[in-house]
Amino acid sequence: MAQVLLHIPKKVHQAVWTQLLPRHLRSEEAGFMYVSHRPQDEAEVFEYVDWYPIPSNGFLHRSRYHFELTDETRARVIKQAHDLGTSLVEFHSHAGRWPAAFSASDLLGFQEFVPHVWWRLKGKPYLALVVTRTNFDGLAWLTDPRTPQHIDGIVIGGSVLTSTKLSPLKYSTYEQ
């Protein structure tokens, strides 16, 4: 299986992490990155095109442990990806001091949202990252909307941040 790498300029990385992880994180923050897909010999490379931070009125609900976007927000980010001809990368933050991993509610949300985005963007890959103050985890749906694989790293300049890879690739654990 090829590595999955997300390339982000250093200034963009700093801005994204600052937005997602404010000094006093009262609830999960979220945003979407628009990326171009550049398959290479040994890696699936996704390169930054644009960033959209979700404003407070873009959430239907959010807390320290869960968020839900408004229908208008979901439609807006999907339409923008369609107009740009890009894939979407969902980013959101988790509070706390434990290593980054998607929660059960995150994984269940992917079961509904990823197939919808996959259909709307005509089979373009979908990526999702969860970030904490110390690390990140990520999943990528490259070949179909039901089979994720881990994101290996984020390339920032000459450095690579590696994923915790703590999130399960199968949802059956959470379907009981």
Residue ranges and their predicted role:
Residues 1-89, 96-176:
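Conserved beta-strand-loop surface patch within small alpha/beta domains used
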